[in-house]
Amino acid sequence: NEKSKPQTETASHQENHRHQPTETIKLNNGKKWKVDENMMMHIRNMEKDVAVFKKFEFSDYKSLAEKLKQNIGLLTSNCTMKGKAHDELHKWLLPYIDLVNKLAKSKNETEGEALFQTLQHSFITFNQYFQ
C-alpha cells in the first residue's frame, strides 16, 4: 500500500533513533551544519507555520500540531542526510517531534501556550546550529 509507506518509513526512522537520550547539539568545528535542501524546505515550512500562528481558540493548537506533523512526516520520509550532520540534526529533531506530539495532546490552553512557546524557542536553537 503506497499510501502508508511514508508513515511506515517515518515510524521506523524515528524508532531507529529513539533509544538515544537527548544530547547537546555541537557545531561543526565552530560552523553551522548544512541541512540538505529538500529537508530544509520542510523545516522552514514548520518554522513559518509557527511564526505566523495566531491562536483564537484552544483547538487552534491542535490544528497547528497536525500541520507540523504533516511536515515532520515529509521531512523524515525524505531524509537523505548521513554522518555527523544527520546525527546532530536528530539531537534537535527528536525533542522537536516530542514537543509537537505533546502539543497535539495538550489538555488546556495553559499547557498549549507553554508548549507553543517551547516550539518557538526550538527554532532559535535550530538556527544556531544549522543552515
Regions found by a protein language model. Name each.
Residues 13, 17, 76, 81, ...:
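Short flexible/disordered coil segments
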Residues 38-41, 45, 63, 67-70, ...:
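Charged, amphipathic alpha-helical oligomerization/scaffolding segments
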Residues 86-131:
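Helix-rich interaction surfaces within compact, conserved domain-sized segments
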Residues 49-56, 71, 75-78:
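Short hydrophobic alpha-helical module
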Residues 27-38, 53-60, 81, 88, ...:
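Non-transmembrane, amphipathic alpha-helical segments
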Residues 2-55:
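Immediate post-signal-peptide N-terminus of mature secreted/exported proteins
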Residues 9-17, 70-73, 98-99:
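The feature marks either
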Residues 72-90:
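Short, solvent-exposed, charged loop/turn and helix-capping segments
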